[in-house]
Amino acid sequence: MSAKPNYETMYILRPDIAEEEVESHANKYRDLVVEAGGEVIDSQMRGKRRLAYNIGKHREGIYIQLNYSGDGKQVGPLEKAMRLSEDVIRYLTVKYEGQHSSLGRSTAPANPMASNTPRTEGQEQAKTEPQTAPA
């Protein structure tokens, strides 16, 4: 039996919500993962940070990172709940092929897509044909 893959969901909450609401959201999303058959590995409050660009009218956001393992069925309900929440302004889920350590670092390759990136026919042709300068 193979090990379940690991997932990391980073989500950003509105900066103007109360500390109790932040904890409530974090607990709700952890519970959703467990209810869907996943196992929460780690949940970290990254704090309020300035966004790289405005999201809606928000210039800051409260970052929370959720690491969990599962068979993939946890991602859909989790992201649906985040999408429907007015307090979540952005979220992203990443699947890790390697095992996650307790420190939140993956033992997977630094760039897992580098060797697995499919090329289109035009990209392969451009690599194999020599480039000549126009006359």
From Swiss-Prot:
Location of the region described as Disordered in the Swiss-Prot/TrEMBL record: 99-135
Keywords, alphabetical: Ribonucleoprotein, Ribosomal protein, RNA-binding, rRNA-binding
Example of a GO cellular component annotation carried by this entry: ribonucleoprotein complex
InterPro entries registered for this protein in UniProt: Ribosomal_bS6, Ribosomal_bS6_sf, Ribosomal_S6_plastid/chlpt, Transl_elong_EF1B/ribsomal_bS6
GO molecular function terms attached to this record: small ribosomal subunit rRNA binding; structural constituent of ribosome
Domain of life, per lineage: Bacteria
Pfam families, alphabetized: Ribosomal_S6
Compositionally biased intervals (Polar residues): 99-120
Keyword flag Zinc-finger: no
Single Gene Ontology BP annotation: translation
Gene3D superfamilies per UniProt: 3.30.70.60
CDD domains xrefs: bS6_chloro_cyano (cd15487)
Function: Binds together with bS18 to 16S ribosomal RNA.
Annotated PANTHER family: MITOCHONDRIAL 28S RIBOSOMAL PROTEIN S6, SMALL RIBOSOMAL SUBUNIT PROTEIN BS6M
Family: Belongs to the bacterial ribosomal protein bS6 family.
Name recorded for this polypeptide: Small ribosomal subunit protein bS6
Naturally occurring in which organism (per UniProt): Synechococcus sp. (strain RCC307)
